[in-house]
Amino acid sequence: GLGDVYKRQIIDSCGELLDEWKKDEHFESVALTLNVGGESIIDDETFDQADFLKKVAASPECPKSACPSPERYMKAFDCDADHIYAVTLSAELSGSYNSAVLGRNLLEEEKPGRKIHIFNSKSASIGQTLIGMKIQECEEAGYSFEKVIETVDEYIAGQHTFFVLDNLETLRKNGRLSKVKALVASALKIKPVMGSTDEGNICQLDQARGINKALVKMAGQIAEKTQNSEEKVLAISHCNCHERAILLKNALQEKMPLKNIVVLDTAGVSSMYANDGGVIVAV
């Protein structure tokens, strides 16, 4: 159990929630809003991935996302918990982190003295999920608020995110690939293997002809970049392509020892950016 000290974790909705978190009052998802074809879709437990992908396919415009307001974060932080943590999308990719900081400042003016810490994941999707798992592990071990922050900051500094997408257009059209040097023509069926930089931007690591070869190359990149892998939990999220996720899981298990592998479906924001057929990994 979590002992007497009451904790709260707030994760923006780009971060996939584990099934047990969905039923746990210690966890709350703060929703981003998705806009597709003039319709606003709240990325909460009502999100319907199949319906969303259908709408994206039918819409001539590229979908967009809007981050939660500072007031929404303020409301989430305004609770009786002794320790409150937020885990946001990379500040390089979204305004969610800044919104959370503003929300904390607003609450501090009205009700000073709360212990609230906001982690910039420098990642997205299941990168945020793994950070949430690390916070939970530290809290369950009885760490002080300061020690949790220190340990999780270290974890974030050592975490890497990787992805292979069938379709990079949503990222590209929303300006999320502006820092990427070498993107290749999709006409050649070349699929880039993408990754995260230390600051939380997106970079290209490799490429292959066809998505299955790209997944195998990604597995190689992950094995190469992961130290002490036998002590680490690796997470995979996929957008409507379970068989690809399993292909990748098997490739990873052949290449490296891991403590555990978690496989989740992408929620709303991750589905929007990964697109149908995309696979994301964090470790």
Predicted regions and their residues:
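Active-site cofactor/cluster-binding pocket
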Residues: 68-84, 88-111
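Mixed-charge interfacial surface used for oligomerization/domain docking
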Residues: 13-35, 93-96, 100-105, 115-117, ...
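Generic beta-sheet signal
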Residues: 7, 84-86, 232-234
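N-terminal glycine-rich anion-binding loop in soluble enzyme alpha/beta folds
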Residues: 8-72
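Short, small-residue-biased leader/transition segments that mark boundaries at the very start
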Residues: 1-6
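Short secondary-structure transition/capping motifs
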Residues: 41, 62-69, 88-96, 120, ...
